[in-house]
Amino acid sequence: VSIESRRSTIPPFYVMDVWKAAAERARTHGDVLSLAAGQPSTPAPAPVLRATKTAIDAELFGYTETFGILALRRAIAGHHHRSYGYPVDPDDVVVTTGSSGAFTLIFLAAFDPGDTVVVARPGYPAYRNTLTALGCRVVELDCRAETRFQPTVAMLEELPRPPKGLIVASPANPTGTMIDPDELAAVAGWCDAHGTLLISDEIYHGITYGGERTASAWETSRSGVVIGSVSKYFSMTGWRLGWMLAPPELRPALQRLASNMTVCPPAISQYAALHAFGDEARTELDAHVHRYAVNRAILLEGLAGLGITDLAPADGAFYAYADIGHLTADSMAWCADVLANTGVALAPGLDFDIVNGHRTIRLSFAGATAEIEAALTRLGDYLRRT
């Protein structure tokens, strides 16, 4: 008799399986170049590291307020005001244990089993898998290159009935595409008119290329939820700190759930992150983005030279999402073979698209430039052999 619950029988996060296989190869061969990791290889900014040492010396290890310390909520509110021009009160801010914690909290606070929540396909698998585990009905919009792999009002109008929730991510994982600001405003308006909770995943804000404006959902509507994180732009993945901007009517439920589930976000991470939003940190972090831009150019040019040319636009984040249908009809097996024969780790598309992901892969360019170049050389040798 299995002791697993039915809700636990969701698909695995395949990227984590790739990481495990890559770590095992690194132990046995020592030659792994990972283009699978969805995390920066750059360090947390210097002011954050200094503040961490100060917090440790001051023994700031105890519980904090459930929604986070007031100083951090003020800093996050100020960050949104500076970045997008809209005012944010510290009471609007809910600090969480990573953006993953924010998503779980808002899913529990806003949706009941059986509720329909709409997501884009391709998209981040944890949306679909977590919602499924919570008993929600997940409807995927088939988003293609024509809409830059982003949902549109026209797609929402074709649904048989308005959903309880809609998740929009811009810049998106895995495609790196950004939703047009006017389209985001239209989507937010549609959600307001139809009683649909808009959840805007904005964790890759700050990492963009080409100068297009990055829009935030709260520029248009305060009835939705904005999700942020220190993981991506701020290079603080393992610190496990995120936040959401939540409307007042959801905060009591969020408070009840968060206080029971996590008590509070990690204290040391909160005191450290206070110093992530200043000018010194931003100068350092923008230099990281410049490095990603260099890596992006090298990777896109290198892939084209290898005959891999069907790519999502990669407006932001640090991913290239490629169609390799001319090379394989099984991206899982192909990625495993590439790792076994070259030491290059890639993310199979099935994580992000359960319909067409058998012919796609995601490549991260967040690593060192030399590693991107070396990985391209190995991939070229592999493709010539096969």
PLM regions and their residue ranges:
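N-terminal small-domain helix-loop-helix segment of the aminotransferase-like
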Residues: 3-98, 105, 276-279, 298, ...
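Conserved core segment of the aminotransferase class I/II
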Residues: 222-290, 300-302, 382-384
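Helix C-cap/helix->beta junction micro-motif
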Residues: 25-29, 134, 193-194, 342, ...
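Conserved glycine-rich beta-strand-loop-beta hairpin in the small C-terminal domain of fold type I
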Residues: 274, 290-300, 311-324
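Short acidic capping loops at alpha-helix termini that bridge into adjacent secondary structure
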Residues: 87-93, 113-116, 222-223
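Active-site phosphate-binding strand-loop segment of PLP-dependent enzymes
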Residues: 139, 143-212
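PLP-dependent enzyme catalytic core of the Aspartate aminotransferase-like
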Residues: 337-346, 352-386
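Conserved PLP-anchoring active-site segment centered on the Schiff-base-forming lysine
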Residues: 109-131
